[in-house]
Structure formats: C-alpha cells, structure tokens
Amino acid sequence: MEGKTLIVSVLIMSLFMAQNQVDANICCPSIQARTFYNACLFAVGSPSSCIRNSSCLDISESTCPRGYTNDILENTGDAVTEYCKLGCVSSVCGALTILQNSDASEIVNGEVEKCTMACSTVCTKGSMNAVENA
C-alpha cells in the first residue's frame, strides 16, 4: 500500500511540475495543446514526437510567434483562470479518478482528494493574485 501512495504522489507532483517547468522554447497554440505536450513529454519522453503531435513549435527566439501565445512562461492570471475553467481536476487528476473507479481503496480515495484540493488551491483568487505578482 505504501508503494501505491508513493507512485500516486509522484504522479501528481510530476503532472504539476510538467506544467510549471521553465521551457521557453516550446510555443503552443492553446492551453490544451500545451497540456497535451507536457503529458506526452512525461509519458513518451521524446520532445520531437510530442511537438509534432501537439501542434506546438520549438523555436530559438525568446518570444512565441503570432497564434502561438501559450508558451510555458505565460502563467498570468488569465491563463490560470482559463486553465481552471477547462478543468484542472479533470486534466490533472483524471488518471487518479480512473484508478479510483477500478480500485476504490482508502489510499486512492485520499490521493484523489489531495489532488482535488491542490487544484482548488491553484484556482482560488488568492493563488491567481500570487501568480500575477510573481
């Protein structure tokens, strides 16, 4: 059971870190494309394959071209609000929810609750102000 808790905790932490890592060379046309790229990179580990499948661009400049405004550094309040509207819980906690449906153990239920609370914390007004001021 402790092994499952560790795996689930690492999965949650990795999903959040993948969305917050500094990677200014990848520009994506939407938040959905950015999320897909990050998930692909985490699962597959091949940046070129993930770029090709997500419609993102790998650029050498520090500014994304027109139409590709969702670079990783664009974590302003508007981007956080849009991410929260699209469903932080469904995108970040989706794998845990599937696991919960197949194995409704106390540990999995607790991890789903922690993931949901993490999304709630990120999506509150106070957290958005902190991101805007950072």
Curated annotation (Swiss-Prot):
Disulfide bonds join 27-64, 28-56, 40-50. Keywords: Disulfide bond, Plant defense, Secreted, Signal, Toxin. Residues 1-24 form the signal peptide. Gene3D superfamilies: Thionin-like (3.30.1350.10). Residues 71-134 form a propeptide. One of its GO terms (cellular component) is nucleus. InterPro entries: Thionin (IPR001010), Thionin-like_sf (IPR036391). GO terms for biological process: defense response. Transmembrane segments: none annotated. It is found in: Secreted. GO terms for molecular function: toxin activity. PROSITE patterns: THIONIN (PS00271). It comes from the Eukaryota. Pfam families: Thionin (PF00321). Belongs to the plant thionin (TC 1.C.44) family. PANTHER family: THIONIN-2.1-RELATED. Thionins are small plant proteins which are toxic to animal cells. They seem to exert their toxic effect at the level of the cell membrane. Their precise function is not known. This is Probable thionin-2.4. It comes from Arabidopsis thaliana.
